[in-house]
């Protein structure tokens, strides 16, 4: 199922999540991707993920620990957040990483079989504007596990942008009446 969110001149389409292993459900991957967003985010990508979860009727069973979200950096091209099950008071917190697929594959030390499965799943998606949002989980005492990716397409309405730029920059100096007088 494809869900589309239009934010000003940006159109974001979120498709069903692709699990790295058959053990994980696409709904769980999308829920973790949404919960790993910074609290109160107005970013178009975060809003598109939230919109997709709401359209699909996915509940968000995790709560983010206060001030636990860390933004991506040059050394670490993915964000991290500490989540906890919202409905259980005694649930243990765990870390979620969300971001660049290649970086999370390296972090999780993904096997070549899982990489091949993910590449096969990506072949059906258009390469233009396609960005896989990868999700990985780290529970205490266990290594990082790549759960899967949420395919997202970002498209800008370049016609409106180019027209706005042209209207802003265009100054009528050599207009038709001046050209007629010149000839």
PLM region spans:
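Cytosolic catalytic regions of ATP/NTP-dependent phosphoryl-transfer enzymes
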Residues: 1-113, 117-146, 175-183
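Short, acidic loop-to-helix structural element flanking the phosphoryl-transfer center
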Residues: 152-170, 179
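Short glycine-/small-residue motifs
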Residues: 149
